[in-house]
Amino acid sequence: MKRLGIVAAAMLVVVPAFAGVVEDSGIRGGIVVQIGCKDVKSLANLLVNNRVLVHWLDVDAKRIEEVRDSLRSDRLYGRISAAVFDGENLPYTDNLINLMVIEDPQCRITQEEMMRVLVPGGMVVVGGKKTTKPVPSNIDEWTHFLHGADNNAVANDTVVAAPRTIQWVSNPRWGRSHEEAASVSALVSANGRVFAIMDEAPNISIRFMPDWKLVARDAFNGMLLWKRDIPAWSDHLRHFRAGPVHLPRRLVAVGNRVYVTLGLDAPVSILDASTGETLKVLKGTERTEEIAVDDGVVYLAVGTSEVYRRGGGLHERGEPKAADFRYIVAIDPGSGRQVWKKDFTGTDFLLPMSMTVRNGSVFYQDINGVGRLDARTGTEIWEKKRRTVARRMSFSSPTVVATDEVLLVADRIPKVDSREPQQMAA
């Protein structure tokens, strides 16, 4: 990871002693460092929840040993650990620490060194004065499966480069199988956090029943923030790359909110990104397969996309039976109110992975062509006829990417000379 050259924005707010310093910082989880400490009790006060780890630094090796013994006797060692340092150089890689607390305002650590180890958005409190490290404009988030709601899988990030070091590693380190369904089903990032839907069942054999979880970690240090159970997901014995293609489109993170279906036939839930707490369940959104969030509005593709798939139904393996409806709906996440709805019935079958949102427009592709809707009202602006295949393999989907100037569409076509237009092109 490249070193970030950042000038900190100082906020001169004094907090009394160090009581409640973690709560006052607004940091809900991560790695907290305290430099200098009068007693173990003040260290224990930093453990405000199970999402926090504390590391104490001091120049006095004898004092470190005393604190370690005290932590062990109180059964706190592990969640709190201690180490010696030279008083100037912090023993951390760049962008690792969420909160640093320094009792002595005359400490020899330079502000540049403090800013080096803080994560973007992290905070240092020196003698009661807080300084926050700003989030640089040259790093980006990956809020949807294909970066954003426009499906343009290109990050606006100039810091990312060829890997030089490993910032952090978490479990599971290996997938359960490379022949069946992938162990990581979806992955997005927002506001300094990474969210993933993954199978945490034992990897000794793919024949064990799956254990799907939604897992949240700090994006810079990998600290586990929270987990949510997903009771029913796609069949884990599906062959690798056999679909369904909509699985990674069921998870979106924007700001401090996570939008997810906690099950194949579950409605869309809106979660607090820092705690995993459910803030709202959008009623009537069962069987949602794709989620997009743009300009404060939630757009959903609802209904079964694999109804015309080859190979028969997977409901016999525990997956829900195919729905007899298919539509795009816009919802106000604050009230849960439906703003508009566009039905796709009969021959107007909405293809998976095609819902795209950009600059006040919603684009889609059905088996008859490509269309554009007004994102505010759902009114159809135009439709371009472009016949395509309805009955296709479960891994097959079109590519639809929106830019400011053009809409890019790529898909297979039916056989021109075939009397059965739903056959796949050779």
Q: Whereabouts are the PLM-identified features?
A:
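A short acidic, Gly/Pro-enriched loop at the edge of an enzyme's catalytic core
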Residues: 88-99
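A short glycine-rich, Lys/Arg-flanked "PGG" loop and its adjoining helix->strand segment in the class I
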Residues: 108-123
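Conserved SAM-binding strand-loop segment of SAM-dependent methyltransferases
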Residues: 75-87
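Blade/loop signatures of beta-propeller domains
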Residues: 135-172, 316-318, 323-329
